[in-house]
Amino acid sequence: MKKNFILNVFEKASICRHFENEVFKRVSKKEITFPVYLSAGQEYAPATIAEIALKKRIKPLIFGQHRGHSIYLSFGGNIIKLIKELKGKKDGCTHGMGGSLSIHSTKINMYGHDGFMGSNACIGTGACFSSKKPTIIFIGDAALEEDYVLASLSWVSKKELPILFVVDDNNYAVLTKKAE
């Protein structure tokens, strides 16, 4: 690997981690009063994938999970708009209506999560099937237990769609633990 690739990934991941730490502080001080879904500890997957996409000049459709701050920032989302979104401001990335859960930006092709666990797998699969554009879908380990996510994986395989599924194993799944 080239040195600048590794440094670029490190820089993206560091920005994401610092952002998450600052959000946590602001929530603790009640400066952010809306619910937030932090992704600290999960920043290297989106940082690495975003850097690969940048180097390969791929502008994928991105379907993030509810812990999407690092995804948004890694793929070039506007940090100021994200801060404003977390505060419910109209000039936030989702006009203050999506909050932490549903980060959306057509500028970076990122489509907000709707709140149903794993539903972004189905929505992203449909978007890819329709557009035939490279697509990245981020889900958590708990979402991988949902039947409709498994159906999406099957459909992607059958139709040979250009989709990368990224599963964040944060050990939050309640039905299937790693030990099993």
Model-derived segments and spans:
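Short, contiguous strand/loop micro-motifs
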Residues: F10, I139-G140, A173-L175
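Thiamine diphosphate
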Residues: K159, L164-E180
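Cofactor-binding active-site loop characterized by glycine-rich and histidine/acidic residues
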Residues: N21-F24, K29-K159
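Cofactor-/ligand-binding subdomain signature composed of acidic, glycine-rich
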Residues: M1-F34
